[in-house]
């Protein structure tokens, strides 16, 4: 599926609906959207809107072909944090999206109507006391979307399972409602009370991620790559990236350090071993435009 197709239908439909709506006061989010992602992705990403004022808007513009800058800002102003899990394949990229947002129920019903090319299926689940709870699952034939509450959006792969995870967590129907690996969750989780304002990523299949980032085939026998990205306080057009590499065998570390120095240019970066198999590389400079092109889904 082309990248424009992932968010395009969803955001285009919502655009018409929310443009005439006043913002609704935000109540507490009842279930953390990050819990709704599954373990089937090879790369995970957290993008808080506070990380860069243009980034969420650029994600919208990159997804919706032809959308104006002002319309993209309108949509992005209602999105606080985007969590994404993705698998890049030869002909398409498979996505799973969960987000903190603010899309009123009336706007969702208006946007995701049959008139606009959407069909709605009902997912009925039991609340644990014998009472049915209904959730709407919307489809345009290519994309699935659901809004289990006003401040939670689910888009992409396995949306019914995401909604069921939400339901189980909200009604305390299982001890551990989420199936997302705890290491991934703990790295990406966002504390709204004490936000760090950073983009964070976790590659559980790191070889393909490094190839995407550097353009080179780097095989270091890694367990994972994770890190964070934030705006460079000294340059408005630049990000600063940190990487953490966990190796299966320490013998790969020396070769990796040399290859990474060539790939990233580590002259001004800090490189050190936290453990014999855990290499940390920080203070890597990358232009915002370059990162936008990588991260815009």
Listing of model-derived features with the role each one plays in the protein:
Residues 22-24:
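Bacterial signal peptide processing site
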Residues 28, 32-82, 121-141, 146-237:
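An internal, short helix-loop-strand segment that often contains or flanks glycine-aspartate motifs
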Residues 81-103, 230-249:
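A short acidic-to-branched-hydrophobic micro-motif
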Residues 18-20:
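C-terminal motif of bacterial Sec signal peptides marking the signal peptidase cleavage site
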Residues 196-297:
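Leucine-rich, highly hydrophobic segment in Treponema pallidum outer-membrane-associated proteins
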Residues 1-8:
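Bacterial N-terminal signal peptides that target proteins for export
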Residues 11-15:
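Hydrophobic helical h-region of N-terminal Sec-dependent signal peptides
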Residues 106-150, 262-278:
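Short Gly/Thr-rich strand-loop-strand
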């Amino acid at each position: 599926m082309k990248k424009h197709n992932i968010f395009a239908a969803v955001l285009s439909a919502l655009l018409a609906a929310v443009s005439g709506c006043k913002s609704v006061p935000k109540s507490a989010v009842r279930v953390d959207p990050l819990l709704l992602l599954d373990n089937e992705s090879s790369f995970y990403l957290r993008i808080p809107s506070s990380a860069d004022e243009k980034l969420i808007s650029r994600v919208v513009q990159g997804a919706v072909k032809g959308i104006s800058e002002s319309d993209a800002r309108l949509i992005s102003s209602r999105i606080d944090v985007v969590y994404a899990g993705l698998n890049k394949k030869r002909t398409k990229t498979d996505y799973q999206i969960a987000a903190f947002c603010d899309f009123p129920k009336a706007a969702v019903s208006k946007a995701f109507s049959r008139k606009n090319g959407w069909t709605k299926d009902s997912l009925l689940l039991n609340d644990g006391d014998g009472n049915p709870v209904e959730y709407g699952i919307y489809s345009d034939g290519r994309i699935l979307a659901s809004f289990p509450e006003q401040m939670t959006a689910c888009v992409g792969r396995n949306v019914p399972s995401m909604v069921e995870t939400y339901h189980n967590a909200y009604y305390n129907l299982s001890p551990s409602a989420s199936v997302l690996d705890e290491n991934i969750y703990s790295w990406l989780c966002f504390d709204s009370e004490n936000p760090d304002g950073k983009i964070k990523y976790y590659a559980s299949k790191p070889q393909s991620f490094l190839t995407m980032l550097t353009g080179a085939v780097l095989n270091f026998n890694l367990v994972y790559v994770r890190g964070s990205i934030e705006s460079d306080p000294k340059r408005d057009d630049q990000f600063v990236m940190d990487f953490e590499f966990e190796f299966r065998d320490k013998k790969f570390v020396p070769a990796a350090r040399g290859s990474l120095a060539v790939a990233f240019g580590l002259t001004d970066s800090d490189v050190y071993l936290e453990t014999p198999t855990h290499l940390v590389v920080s203070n890597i400079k990358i232009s915002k435009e370059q990162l936008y092109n990588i991260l815009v889904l």
